[in-house]
Amino acid sequence: MFAVIKTGGKQYHVVANQVVKVEKVIGNAGDVVEFNDILMVGQEDNTIIGAPVVADALVTAEIIKQARARKVISFKKRRRQNSKCTRGHRQEVTILRILEILTGGLKPKRAVAKPIKEEAAVLKETTKKTKATVSIKKTAKKPSEKKSAPQKKAAVVSNNKED
């Protein structure tokens, strides 16, 4: 059985136990992820094409490794200008092993890991609780009196013409 899945803006033709490199998928090594955007599912005698996706189809995969692809060098040169620019870029990729291709609303054998967003929300709640329980006593400083600069004596102006 094979499937065509869509992830990271690209389409991949996958079969069970295949190792494939895709654009970065959120998760850690050993996590199981699901792909719901299945464009086509097929066997030797039967093929189902989705419009745009196949209903009740699911592909599960295990994250083997989070890695970075080869460096791509971008070089620009403007002739007779003494101007050039060299840049390098490494795309983050995820190496996956396809575990199962399921159709008809079947559930996967291995449990799928919790989404990262839920874990982050749980983490935030626990940090709020710990911050509330821990209280730091601070001694209040007494406000100091502001000292003003000494005032200058005004010059005496006389109205006498004798001076």
Curated annotation (Swiss-Prot):
HAMAP family the record matches: Ribosomal_bL21
Q: Which InterPro entries match?
A: bL21-like, bL21-like_sf, Ribosomal_bL21
Nucleus listed as a keyword: no
Role this protein plays: This protein binds to 23S rRNA in the presence of protein L20.
What are the recorded Gene Ontology BP terms?
translation
* Domain of life per record: Bacteria
What protein name is recorded for this chain? Large ribosomal subunit protein bL21
Species this protein is from:
Bartonella quintana (strain Toulouse) (Rochalimaea quintana)
Q: Which NCBIfam families match?
A: L21
Q: Give the Gene Ontology MF terms in alphabetical order.
A: rRNA binding; structural constituent of ribosome
**Subunit relationships:** Part of the 50S ribosomal subunit. Contacts protein L20.
Q: Where is the segment annotated Disordered?
A: 124-163
A GO cellular component term found in this entry reads: cytoplasm
Please give the family membership noted in the entry.
Answer: Belongs to the bacterial ribosomal protein bL21 family.
**Which keywords, in A-to-Z order, does the entry hold?**
Ribonucleoprotein, Ribosomal protein, RNA-binding, rRNA-binding
